[in-house]
Amino acid sequence: MSSNRVLLLAAMPLLGAALFGQSSGQEMSHADHMEHRFDNAKELAKRFDDPARDAWQLPDQVIDLLRLKRGQTVADIGAGTGYFTVRLAKSEAAPKVYAVDIEPSMVSYLGERAAQEHLSNVVAVQAAADTPNLPEAVDLVLIVDTFHHIGGREVYFRRLAKSLKPGGRVAIIDFKPDSPEGPPKEFRFTPEQIVSEMSKAGYTLTAQHDVLPRQHFLIFAIADRPSR
């Protein structure tokens, strides 16, 4: 697989397999998993935005723990159909939200959804192969169920650091090894593995929240910068 193809996954949308699991009888190769495409946004929205997800995703608690302030800016990388993007935009802090995705159909869908819901603080962003293409530095990067799809993570997160404001944070939410939902077992991480990888990329863990039953919830800052 080429390096560009691996990095293409840095802003992949939430995966159907990741959200709803894969039976133990199925086998998926590393290449198959990493190269899966998601170009039917309207159909995927039925799964990604299923209200039943709220019971284990706990979006309101997640947003409360992000402790956003008015006037701040967020990048939702791998925004998919906007599950967190829309909730962030409608939250009390009402931050500006860059809804970032690699799939053109997702980006179009996000733009249309923002317009339909009159969310002037949402901007849909088409990611490139090796960068989220953020138009400005942000206070928070949120990466939900996408970390395990990012190829060349050390390089990617070092580049991402340039898009963080001083005191900026990166919040990573991804599936636990024993979650009933999620990607194949080989694509799941322990918190220690995520912390180790982020440390190599120049980040330090500033918070770990154990409120989600099926996912890790870790927050990082640049190691040599103070966190907010």
What are these regions (language model features)?
Residues 117-130:
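Conserved SAM-binding strand-loop segment of SAM-dependent methyltransferases
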Residues 71-80, 171-195:
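Conserved class I S-adenosyl-L-methionine
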Residues 132-141:
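A short acidic, Gly/Pro-enriched loop at the edge of an enzyme's catalytic core
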Residues 103-104:
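Conserved SAM/SAH-binding beta-strand->alpha-helix loop
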Residues 54-72:
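Conserved alpha-helix/loop element of class I SAM-dependent methyltransferases that forms part
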Residues 154-169:
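A short glycine-rich, Lys/Arg-flanked "PGG" loop and its adjoining helix->strand segment in the class I
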